[in-house]
């Protein structure tokens, strides 16, 4: 029996029971792990094709050879089947499907309108607040840049409501002309509302109208001899002109569209997505879907579109660079999802063709960079394996480091590096929990490794897969401590290397410990540079995590350190001033004015911060 006959037999047995209906089918292996999710207009007809075909492509034959079980879900129509398929693929990540990796929600710029003093912030997730949402932006950096521009031109507040309500004097943003000081009534409500309305117009792509309004306001102020006010409008016009000249060109005059171009080479694909909203280019993002080398660009694009838009708002127009077989079905499905007509165009001429050509050029360049980096990383892995005589190949390395100051806010950190670079979704930080371990580097390392591998053993495949190599920041002592943990979990064959700095802590003078031996490399050795890079990234992540924990602890504990300040008074002070730092900056009279804080307690608080 051919190996693919196994899956064919499973399908043959199920076929008589399957209704002639649209739906989704799932192929599972002997451990009930989903191998593949597919959709069909007519389930029996689609599944019969697997049985009838004699010469399957390698990927399909391999899938059928591992198929022990078939599951079916019927749907009301083909559009529902398409949506369910995309949802199941994203949820289960079957190994024989095209997979969109690193898909995340995009940031929006949010301008609140729940009160008279609107605030501008960056927003991710559900749009459950009352106000105006602008986006999506391709990255947090693009969204932050837009917020900075709104601050610079329109001087809208970015502080949270608690800080805003309890401000007694303006913050530094007022001093550098990034806020108009509404918290201390330096601007009246009517003028502030005008600024907010103009900011909304600006992000909506109506900057010419704003320029006219600002010019008019400047002239009116000049006529009234209010030159200080006129200078404010003059500065805003100047800032607006600078920003307009630096904004990306939208040659095709796209109002609400995504431009999506795929480029395939050497069995790998990059898909570039450019976001156009309100006639503005709001950046682009590169994706590298996982797929078999023999899958066509059309297949990859179709699968990408459904997975990409499964949890995102869809623009009215999607411009792509390759024909897809199920274009009409995808249009219909996305239109139903949005309750609005969605159009997918393959741009072949005119300005839209120029835009898609630019996106395709970006996709090609991104893919070439990715292939180069992947090949380079593989070479670096091979260099490490050769230097330390590691028999099995390297694809994944975990690096560990600790950070603390005199045993306080102790944190352990783990970072991961794979063939495609640093794997951020596998980064972990460990708050040290065991009393007495906080100041003991060896005990901290043992606790971190114990927690990491204990969970891996308990949860099996549901937690992080085991690495091919562990790298420890430390010397012989750390190596011995880590080895004890690995032996305890039966991981005797998991390679581990410790990297210790020299006596003068100079980079390039590192000593490596492995299996009871010590090694030193030439200062110009690429393997040394690579392992330094891994060590430094783990150190950076540990330090960052420690600082965040320390900052949180400082904010939390400042008021807790004052005798006589219980939870009720603490809450009253924080509600009034917004933060412990604001209490520190307050005068004695300001502290005394807080409800529930009598003169004696106010004096104690003031003296605590100023003695």
Swiss-Prot record:
HAMAP family membership: UvrC (MF_00203)
Domain called UVR: residue spans: 208-243
MF-aspect GO terms: DNA binding; excinuclease ABC activity
UniProt family annotation: Belongs to the UvrC family.
The protein, known as: UvrABC system protein C
Keyword Cytoplasm belongs to the record: yes
Main location per the UniProt record: cytoplasm
Subcellular location: Cytoplasm
Pfam families: GIY-YIG (PF01541), HHH_5 (PF14520), UVR (PF02151), UvrC_RNaseH (PF22920), UvrC_RNaseH_dom (PF08459)
Origin species: Pelagibacter ubique (strain HTCC1062)
Domain GIY-YIG: 20-98
């Amino acid at each position: 029996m051919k190996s693919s006959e196994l899956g064919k037999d499973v399908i043959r047995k199920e076929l008589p029971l399957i209704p002639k209906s649209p739906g989704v089918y799932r192929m599972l292996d002997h451990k009930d792990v989903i191998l593949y999710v597919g959709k069909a207009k007519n389930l029996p007809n689609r599944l019969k094709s697997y049985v009838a075909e004699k010469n399957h492509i390698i990927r399909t034959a391999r899938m059928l050879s591992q198929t022990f079980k078939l599951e079916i879900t019927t749907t009301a129509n083909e559009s529902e089947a398409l949506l369910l398929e995309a949802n199941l693929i994203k949820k289960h990540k079957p190994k024989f499907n095209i997979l969109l990796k690193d898909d995340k929600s995009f940031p929006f710029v949010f301008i609140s309108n729940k009160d008279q003093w609107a605030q501008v912030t960056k927003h991710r997730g559900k749009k459950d607040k009352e106000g105006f949402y602008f986006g999506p932006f391709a990255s947090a950096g693009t969204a932050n840049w837009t917020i900075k521009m709104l601050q610079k031109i329109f001087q809208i507040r970015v502080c949270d409501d608690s800080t805003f309500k309890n401000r007694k004097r303006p913050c530094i943003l007022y001093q550098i002309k990034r806020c108009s000081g509404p918290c201390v009534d330096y601007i009246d409500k009517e003028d502030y509302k005008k600024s907010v309305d103009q900011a909304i117009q600006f992000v909506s792509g109506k900057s010419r109208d704003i320029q006219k309004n600002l010019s008019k306001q400047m002239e009116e102020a000049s006529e009234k001899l209010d030159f200080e006010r006129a200078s404010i409008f003059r500065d805003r016009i100047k800032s607006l002109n600078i920003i307009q000249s630096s904004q990306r060109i939208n040659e095709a005059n796209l109002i609400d569209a995504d431009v999506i171009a795929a480029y395939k080479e050497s069995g790998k694909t990059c898909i570039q997505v450019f976001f156009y909203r309100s006639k503005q280019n709001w950046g682009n993002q590169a994706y590298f879907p996982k797929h078999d080398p023999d899958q066509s660009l059309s297949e990859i694009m179709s699968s990408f579109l459904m997975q990409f838009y499964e949890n995102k708002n869809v623009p009215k127009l999607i411009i792509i660079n390759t024909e897809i077989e199920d274009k009409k079905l995808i249009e219909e499905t996305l239109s139903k999802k949005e309750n609005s007509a969605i159009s997918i165009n393959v741009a072949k001429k005119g300005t839209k063709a120029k835009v898609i050509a630019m996106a395709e050029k970006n996709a090609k360049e991104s893919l070439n960079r990715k292939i180069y980096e992947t090949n380079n990383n593989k070479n670096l892995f091979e260099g490490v394996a050769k230097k330390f005589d590691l028999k099995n190949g390297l694809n994944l390395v975990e690096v560990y480091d600790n950070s603390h100051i005199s045993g306080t806010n102790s944190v352990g950190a783990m970072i991961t590096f794979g063939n495609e670079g640093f794997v951020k979704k596998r980064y972990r930080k460990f708050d040290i929990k065991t009393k007495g371990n906080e100041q003991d580097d060896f005990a901290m390392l043992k606790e971190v490794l114990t927690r990491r591998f204990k969970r891996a053993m308990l949860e099996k495949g549901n937690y992080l897969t085991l690495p091919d190599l562990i790298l420890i920041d430390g010397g012989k002592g750390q190596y011995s401590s880590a080895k004890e943990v690995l032996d305890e979990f039966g991981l005797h064959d998991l390679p581990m290397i410790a990297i210790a700095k020299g006596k003068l802590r100079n980079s390039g003078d590192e000593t490596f410990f492995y299996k009871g031996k010590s090694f030193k490399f030439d200062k110009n050795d690429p393997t040394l540079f690579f392992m330094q890079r891994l060590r430094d990234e783990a150190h950076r992540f540990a330090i960052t995590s420690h600082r965040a924990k320390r900052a949180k602890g400082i904010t939390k504990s400042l008021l807790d350190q004052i005798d006589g300040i219980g939870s009720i008074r603490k809450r009253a002070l924080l509600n009034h001033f917004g933060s412990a730092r604001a209490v520190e900056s307050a005068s004695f009279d300001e502290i005394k004015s807080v409800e529930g804080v009598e003169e004696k307690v106010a004096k104690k608080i003031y003296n605590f911060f100023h003695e």
